[in-house]
Amino acid sequence: MSFVTENPWLMVLTIFIINVCYVTFLTMRTILTLKGYRYIAASVSFLEVLVYIVGLGLVMSNLDHIQNIITYAFGFSIGIIVGMKIEEKLALGYTVVNVTSAEYELDLPNELRNLGYGVTHYAAFGKDGSRMVMQILTPRKYERKLMDTIKNLDPKAFIIAYEPRNIHGGFWTKGIRRRKLKDYEPEELESVVEHEIQSK
């Protein structure tokens, strides 16, 4: 490794790459642990420690120049962003989306069910009168698509999304993994719903 330490630019590049990899694994492991994916987190921690042992010894012993210190700090921050982006792309787990709507005529529950979503809905009452509340469980990778779909169907809907800590029983655990959502674009739904309302 002497050829690395003797070349200052190569040293800077090495510090950056090693620290990005190390902090990426560290960030992913922390997120996965919090989400309850213990075995995946353990596998990621193996890679994290491997990078630490192989690379960080070299890095830490060469932080005697200002460019190396700045590169180390920059690599650390980039590693956090990369780790979070990877976790977002993997989209592990599920999201619960609660929707409150005043538009009963839209028949949102059946519209969403026809697209492949599992929907539980019930009547509720707020300051401005009766409302329909829907609870929808969806894999995280479909969360953005579901949000866009609801906004196109009912732009005034009140939407809250959160990740459940534990799920047990009912349609959710048995059906959601087998259920496949229809291939559609959320923007296409607005004109369809408007046409249905006008035809009533």
From Swiss-Prot:
It is a multi-pass membrane protein. Keywords: Cell membrane, Membrane, Transmembrane, Transmembrane helix. The chain crosses the membrane at residues 8-28, 40-60, 66-86. Its main location: membrane. Pfam families: DUF2179 (PF10035), DUF5698 (PF18955). The keyword GTP-binding does not apply. This is UPF0316 protein SAB1848c. It comes from Staphylococcus aureus (strain bovine RF122 / ET3-1). Belongs to the UPF0316 family. GO terms for cellular component: plasma membrane. It is found in: Cell membrane. The keyword Metal-binding does not apply.
